[in-house]
């Protein structure tokens, strides 16, 4: 079982300094089931980060959004610069290459460097947590937990429900965890990936959708 120590380096590369981020207007809420935002990554002009440096790559690739981590104990993330309240966030993710011990997942309620995360590792573990004030805290669990629903060599469909104080994580359409937290009420959504002790994590996201719960 993975221990809490793996989260000691769960510090993300901030491509824009949080304190200088522009104010993002709130997106209008819709009716339950309405699609609030959708990205298929077919065009590279929709505003997601395009980065290539010694730390990694984030870019549109092959009709998806690729994140490659070149450094151990390192993470990258990207957001579309939106502001939502309650959301249901979904995406497909596939490991292209690299170690099966990795991090890949969804974010919600990102504000000024703080957010909730929902992650899996291709060796069969998952977690719900939050990044707040420079610290990573797991929610409803003390370590990443195993799940039989994680496909180790295939596409995984991830879903994160952020509704009121409730956070619920689904992997391949099966609920694996839920937690309660009151710190964040609204914010941006996004995708993230990271490496543990071995660099080279290379994943491709697609079919990113934000739905009114």
Identify the meaning behind each predicted range.
Residues 56-75:
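Short carbohydrate-recognition loop motifs
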Residues 26-50:
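Extracellular carbohydrate-recognition regions
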Residues 134-157:
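Short, aromatic/His-centered strand-loop micro-motif at the edge of beta-sheets
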Residues 179-206:
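Flexible glycan-contacting loops in extracellular carbohydrate-active proteins
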Residues 154-168:
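Localized edge beta-strand/strand-to-loop motifs within extracellular or lumenal beta-rich domains
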Residues 69-132:
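Secretory/extracellular carbohydrate-interaction modules
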Residues 17-18:
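C-terminal motif of bacterial Sec signal peptides marking the signal peptidase cleavage site
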Residues 41, 206-210:
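Extracellular beta-strand elements of beta-rich domains used
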